[in-house]
Amino acid sequence: MSCYRVEGGFPVSGCIRVCGNKNAALPCIAAAVLTQEPVLLQNVPDIEDVAVMLTIFRAFGGSVERRGNHEYMLHLPQLQTCEVPCEAAQKVRASILFAGPLLARGRKAVLPPPGGDVIGRRRLDTHFLALAALGAQVRLDGVFTFSANKLVGCDVFLDEASVTATENVLMASVLAEGVTVITNAASEPHVQDLCHLLNAMGARVSGIGSNVLTIEGVSALHGTTYTLGADFMEVGSLIGLAVVTRGALTISDVNVRDLRPLGFAFKKLGVIWSEQEHAVSVSASQDLRVNYDFGGMIPKIDDGPWPAFPPDLTSIMTVVATQVEGVILIHEKMFESRMFFVDKLITMGARIILCDPHRALVSGPSALHGSDLVSPDVRAGMAMVLAACCARGVSIIRNVYQIERGYERLVERLQAIGVRIWKEG
């Protein structure tokens, strides 16, 4: 099994380009099932989850042509099967995103339970109830089987603002009869990317960026070319890396509009950056002190549906907080197992009290030391990389497949900005 060897204590420096949004690439690959014509996706990150989604797309009879480093031409002129292969589905949670497109085009979808990160209970009921509202029959018997004679638009109220459920209903409803209104829809930048792609294919989606989406069904979609937005999760990770290593870093190809929720959270830790049109620069001279709430109350960083702070970055913020003077509460509201990785930080010397599965109280700054670590999921794995980079000595990080599911050519790109990291095994 491959692992990362990281020698900590060296500041990053230079410039790094942020990759395309992983969470936009996955539903956009699924959306290519909706048309018989070619769809060219640009700025697609070269990561494991994308590779798995492309494997599933090929299983339906589709062709995938790679054009350059980050461009893929997807073409599915004839849908040969509506079954998602089991082995691939169990590698990535986003395999559930093929339910909506397969229902819309083939009137059937058969999916094994999806895999992905083990970060807590991740219910699928919202998907089932929403697709059933459009007219699908749902059967659960070891696999998930969806079928429909036709899909008819309706008012769909999601019982939670689930990103993937919103995306599934979007893709199912663009070819449905009539009008669909999704209330309590997710509005993250990657959901907006999917909406813009669908409209470029001939769909009629309005309310993009809000929590109410209106979809007027059309008879067919056509091919298009679409460029995915920047991965703001990666931007947040790289900002955190610069902070914990006391480095100066410029991150390019950034959509600065997506960083507002991140800015409020980082400022609680004394972290600021400067913004250019498509870049952010982090200075090496940061006054890393917790900004306490009025009255001297301990502040907290908590997550929620967009535009709240994204849950995928709570692990990163936990590591950053270990290097900041003061006490702060990290409250992971959405996933009850995501904070369990902090026991590894504690073995490295971090002063963290895990209050319960959702909350960690972090006191800093802590002098971390190298350790032997195992990545439990993609975001905690990247957080461990940050911890290793600021720790004294050498750290070994295992199960790096989890990290590479979400971060493109991580070792090569981090080496280019001064991180002493090597992949072994």
Curated annotation (Swiss-Prot):
Phosphoenolpyruvate binds at residues 22-23. Its EC number is 2.5.1.7. GO terms for biological process: cell division; cell wall organization; peptidoglycan biosynthetic process; regulation of cell shape; UDP-N-acetylgalactosamine biosynthetic process. Pathway: Cell wall biogenesis; peptidoglycan biosynthesis. The keyword Manganese does not apply. Keywords: Cell cycle, Cell division, Cell shape, Cell wall biogenesis/degradation, Cytoplasm, Peptidoglycan synthesis, Transferase. The active site is at 117 (proton donor). UDP-N-acetyl-alpha-D-glucosamine binds at residues 93, 312, 334. Its main location: cytoplasm. GO terms for cellular component: cytoplasm. InterPro entries: Enolpyruvate_Tfrase_dom (IPR001986), Enolpyruvate_Tfrase_sf (IPR036968), MurA_subfamily (IPR050068), RNA3'P_cycl/enolpyr_Trfase_a/b (IPR013792), UDP_GlcNAc_COvinyl_MurA (IPR005750). It catalyses: phosphoenolpyruvate + UDP-N-acetyl-alpha-D-glucosamine = UDP-N-acetyl-3-O-(1-carboxyvinyl)-alpha-D-glucosamine + phosphate. It is found in: Cytoplasm. Cell wall formation. Adds enolpyruvyl to UDP-N-acetylglucosamine. Belongs to the EPSP synthase family. MurA subfamily. This is UDP-N-acetylglucosamine 1-carboxyvinyltransferase. It comes from Treponema pallidum (strain Nichols).
